[in-house]
Amino acid sequence: MVSKNTTDKKKNQSIGKVIQVLGSVVDVKFSENSIPKIYDALIVDNNGKKLVLEVEQNIGDEIVRTIAMGPTEGLKRGLDVINTNSPITAPTGMEVLGRMFNVLGDPIDEKPDLDVKREPIHKDAPKYEELVTTTEILETGIKVIDLMIPFTKGGKVGLFGGAGVGKTILIQELINNIAKAHNGVSVFAGVGERTREGNDLYHEFIEAGVLNKTCLVFGQMNEPPGARMRVALTGLTIAEYFRDQKNMDVLLFIDNIFRFTQAGSEVSALLGRMPSAVGYQPTLSTEMGSLQERITSTKNGSITSVQAVYVPADDLTDPAPATTFTHLDARIVLDRSIASLGIYPAVDPLASSSRVLDPEIVGQEHYDIALRVQIALQKYQDLQSIIAILGMDELSEEDKLIVQRARKIRNFLSQSFFVGEKFTGRPGVFVKVNDTVRSFKSILDGEVDYIPETYFLYSSIIDDVIEKYNKDKDK
């Protein structure tokens, strides 16, 4: 949808004609004095349906090249195209909470349209003097994240993993925990993912009672590349309103940032640009930067972002995930080998990292325990090849103890999720950071060496492990 301020003023609108349609790319010719600006939204009536085009290039001779935000089937040469003199706009205001929109800010939840102020989706990043750096830790209630990969309010977290290792369910759990524990507002941008997942997410939010704290924006994988490329900006514009106008701390979830890059690659090819490395667009870094630089903390409030990053063929050196890395404060890497052991969330604590795992930010004890956990898991990984060839019996007593504790730590990093209750039958748990640190300290100090490793799987805190063991022992 476009701004009412512009659509109502006929005298400011210029009319062009469709002269060429190439898939999602539409060329439009205007008169000499009325050529639209880059990123202006144009409207064409396509068999009774409003189709929005976004200007991407001025190719000379009064012709602009545009990308369609919807299907172009049925579009004919010679059709009238109206220039709105405004970019695509997104709805803003508290009224958007509990609602679901498409890339144009039109409701897709079968509820009435909203009569609210709209903001253009293309904006400059906040100026340097408006920025603020905060080091306030955001407690997620997920043990492996709070202990090993803590992140701050206003930080950016990347969620890396291949297909089917649990990225989306981890995002759902974070939304659930933040809404319930911090009374926070979330904006979820579904970028180029499955429609079924969006539908499931919407109904799960209703069941969990967190929909009224969330706004959902979707551009699914069946939609044209223009919609998939711009939907992240629509979600970000809505989040910016809560930060800048309401002085709130907002959570922006993007699932999946790779699809943003992928859509940009498709658009780039359609526009005739020469591809860069591995076939990606030559403007990859610029496009990513223009999105990521707007996701930041200002003196008004903060936008904390969690971005799921699909890693093609599990290759972290691929240009799409590699470009995303440069903007992140923390990265959570999900590993298929951990998922295959039945341990969820399948976070790899050794491949994951956070710049805020620092004694001055999280405290000395937390930092020391996290470091000891990393060392134990690294030693276990180093010993695995020996165990595979010679077996556990060939290890020294000291190494056997390291392996036993590391396996308990590995199992204890698993956790039951609220959003997974109906699939697993296990009730979800929110674990406080202090309980997490205390529990892992007990394992590392050898206080629970007598308890077999199976008791640590899907236990919330160390007290639960001891209680379960004692209950079975008394039988």
Curated annotation (Swiss-Prot):
Pfam families: ATP-synt_ab, ATP-synt_ab_N, ATP-synt_VA_C. PROSITE patterns: ATPASE_ALPHA_BETA. The keyword Ion transport applies. It is a peripheral membrane protein. ATP binds at G161, G162, A163, G164, V165, G166, K167, T168. The keyword Translocase applies. It comes from the Bacteria. It is an enzyme of class 7 (translocase). CDD domains: ATP-synt_F1_beta_C (cd18110), ATP-synt_F1_beta_N (cd18115), F1-ATPase_beta_CD (cd01133). It is found in: Cell membrane. It catalyses: ATP + H2O + 4 H(+)(in) = ADP + phosphate + 5 H(+)(out). Keywords: ATP synthesis, ATP-binding, Cell membrane, CF(1), Hydrogen ion transport, Ion transport, Membrane, Nucleotide-binding, Translocase, Transport. GO terms for cellular component: plasma membrane; proton-transporting ATP synthase complex. GO terms for molecular function: ATP binding; ATP hydrolysis activity; proton-transporting ATP synthase activity, rotational mechanism. Its main location: membrane. Its EC number is 7.1.2.2. Produces ATP from ADP in the presence of a proton gradient across the membrane. The catalytic sites are hosted primarily by the beta subunits. Belongs to the ATPase alpha/beta chains family. F-type ATPases have 2 components, CF(1) - the catalytic core - and CF(0) - the membrane proton channel. CF(1) has five subunits: alpha(3), beta(3), gamma(1), delta(1), epsilon(1). CF(0) has three main subunits: a(1), b(2) and c(9-12). The alpha and beta chains form an alternating ring which encloses part of the gamma chain. CF(1) is attached to CF(0) by a central stalk formed by the gamma and epsilon chains, while a peripheral stalk is formed by the delta and b chains. This is ATP synthase subunit beta. The lineage of its organism: Bacteria, Bacillati, Mycoplasmatota, Mollicutes, Mycoplasmataceae.
